[in-house]
Amino acid sequence: MQQELRKAFGNFGTGVAIIAVRGGDQQAYGLTINSFASVSLQPALLSWCLANESDMMARLAASEKFSVNILAADQQYLSNRLAKPGDHKITADEYTIGAHDGVLLHGALANFECRVHEKINAGDHVLFIGAVDAAHYCSEQRQPLIYFRGAYSNLQVAGDA
């Protein structure tokens, strides 16, 4: 059943995002996710999920602030790098710090600076709900990074065919 469920979930195409935090040493760390969702406009809330066994769980669960960075199609290299277990460090030339201390990745289609609103244990994951303090978006006509059936994919906007 688990394999069938994984394949069924994979048929839902999603965008790709990086969750980012700063450690006590001010080093930025990030993790690739595709479980991002908007929750509410009033109050401004968003959500994302993290597997309990993630090597980033301790770091992300301990932080009261985080940012969500929606990746553009040309940022696949960053998605790949931060999806793998390892140190998850984001280099200083890859981001700026926002007004609410969020790690804002250069080139992202959108960035959200958040405070943890709620953490919910949900099976083998934790559901994080963030209160959005600031949202930034790219006005350039760039394509998002899309994940579908276990691979990156391109978005074709209806009418562009």
Can you describe what each PLM-predicted range is?
Residues 1-161:
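Basic, polyanion-binding surface patches
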